[in-house]
């Protein structure tokens, strides 16, 4: 697995198909697909496809972290190290 989680509940959602109150039912399918993409990625370039991922390197307080979009509000944030997404967590991005 090229994916390590910060939160146990997100890991259980992905590996055991276990629902959690912090994951809105409206994003469950998209979130699972994005986690599959993240898990299968071997290089940063794999995360740029599809363009809807909106892969980016973050700045400021999150310098050294990356993100892909689940939808307009939610992001998966992680540290990309040697082809592995570390400390992956779901962020309800506030605009």
From Swiss-Prot:
Induction: Induced by amino acid starvation. Induced by the protein synthesis inhibitors chloramphenicol, kanamycin and to a lesser extent by spectinomycin.
InterPro entries, A to Z: HigB-1 (IPR007711), RelE/ParE_toxin_dom_sf (IPR035093)
Bilayer-crossing regions: none
Alphabetically ordered keywords of this record: Toxin-antitoxin system
Lineage top rank: taxon: Bacteria
Function: Toxic component of a type II toxin-antitoxin (TA) system. Inhibits translation by cleavage of mRNA.
Note: HigB-1/HigA-1 has been shown to stabilize plasmids very efficiently in E.coli. Three hours of ectopic expression of higB-1 results in bacteriostasis without any detectable loss of viability.
PANTHER family: TOXIN HIGB-1 (PTHR40266:SF2)
Protein name: Toxin HigB-1
Source organism of this protein record: Vibrio cholerae serotype O1 (strain ATCC 39315 / El Tor Inaba N16961)
Gene name per UniProt: higB-1
């Amino acid at each position: 697995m090229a994916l390590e989680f910060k939160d146990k509940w997100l890991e259980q959602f992905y590996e055991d198909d276990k629902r959690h109150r912090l994951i809105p039912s409206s994003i469950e399918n998209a979130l699972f697909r994005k986690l599959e993409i993240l898990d299968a990625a071997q290089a940063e370039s794999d995360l740029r496809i599809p363009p809807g991922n909106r892969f980016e390197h973050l700045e400021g307080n999150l310098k050294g972290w990356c993100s892909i979009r689940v939808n307009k509000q939610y992001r998966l944030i992680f540290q990309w190290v040697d082809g592995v997404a570390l400390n992956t967590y779901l962020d309800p991005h506030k605009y």
